[in-house]
């Protein structure tokens, strides 16, 4: 519960001589009522810490966390013994002059031809989004997983995630393009409710693409989520129930 997480954070911080730069708690309710296996009866309580000094997040931290948990949580166990911290990375966007990146065409006979950079370039400008088709006429609906009619793929782009969703028929596209809005996505994926989301229609593919900014923290190597590359984000969306 939230109260337990707050209490754990307070008690752990009091036990530490130095507080890490970042400390995050998550509770995954993987437990089931009247489970027939121990794993099925257990929840996963995770604490992630980050700091530039490996000593602060190493054995000093893990030992304090384990000792505190053993003294307070009945049935507490760990997924790994106390140990040293692991290196993580931070994604930062950067740019280099185009002339500094060699572009070479290699022909089948092995001949290499340098390709000079373009002499003229244009600034990126916004493109008018394609118009949406007329929504389907109102009628009876069924409460079903979105994946009943829609496919999806997802993945990482720096600290953001892409989700592409598509359907097979024009009738389904009329529904998808008008029903799966940014607001609808926020409701279906509550973890993205407070994040900036971009929506891009691809009518020739009967598809819509979403970009969820910042959901991966500072990139894949930052390990902000248990699914750091957002590969399962699309399947989570497909599993959510909607009125079709």
Regions inferred by a protein language model and the residue ranges of each:
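Short flexible coil/turn linkers enriched for glycine and charged/polar residues
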Residues: 41, 157-159, 204
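Structured core elements
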Residues: 46-48, 162-166, 209-211
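Structured beta-strand/loop patches that form or line metal/cofactor-binding pockets in enzymes
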Residues: 134-152
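Helix-rich interaction surfaces within compact, conserved domain-sized segments
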Residues: 191-244
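Short Gly/aromatic-enriched secondary-structure transition segments
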Residues: 176-183
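Conserved phosphate/anionic-ligand binding catalytic regions in large, soluble enzymes, centered on
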Residues: 152-171
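Short acidic, glycine/serine/threonine-rich loops at helix termini
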Residues: 59-61, 177, 221-224
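C-terminal non-catalytic interaction/assembly regions of soluble proteins
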Residues: 1-133, 170, 186-202
């Amino acid at each position: 519960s939230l109260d337990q997480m707050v209490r754990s954070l307070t008690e752990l911080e009091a036990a530490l001589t130095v507080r890490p730069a970042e400390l995050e708690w998550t509770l995954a309710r993987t437990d089931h009522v009247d489970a027939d296996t121990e794993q099925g009866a257990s929840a996963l309580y995770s604490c992630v810490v980050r700091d530039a000094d490996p000593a602060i997040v190493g054995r000093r931290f893990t030992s304090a966390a384990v000792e505190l948990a053993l003294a307070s949580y009945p049935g507490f166990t760990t997924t790994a013994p106390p140990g040293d911290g692991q290196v993580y990375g931070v994604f930062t966007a950067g740019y280099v002059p185009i002339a500094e990146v060699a572009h070479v065409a290699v022909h089948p006979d092995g001949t290499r031809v340098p390709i000079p950079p373009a002499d003229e370039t244009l600034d990126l400008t916004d493109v008018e989004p394609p118009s949406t088709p007329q929504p389907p006429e109102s009628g009876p609906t069924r409460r079903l997983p979105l994946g009943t009619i829609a496919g999806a793929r997802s993945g990482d782009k720096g600290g953001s995630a892409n989700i592409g969703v598509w359907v097979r028929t024009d009738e389904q596209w009329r529904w998808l393009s008008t029903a799966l809005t940014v607001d609808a996505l926020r409701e279906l994926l509550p973890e993205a409710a407070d994040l900036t989301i971009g929506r891009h229609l691809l009518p020739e593919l009967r598809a819509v693409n979403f970009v969820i900014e910042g959901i991966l923290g500072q990139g894949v190597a930052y390990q902000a989520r248990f699914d750091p590359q957002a590969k399962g984000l699309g399947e989570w969306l497909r599993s959510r129930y909607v009125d079709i």
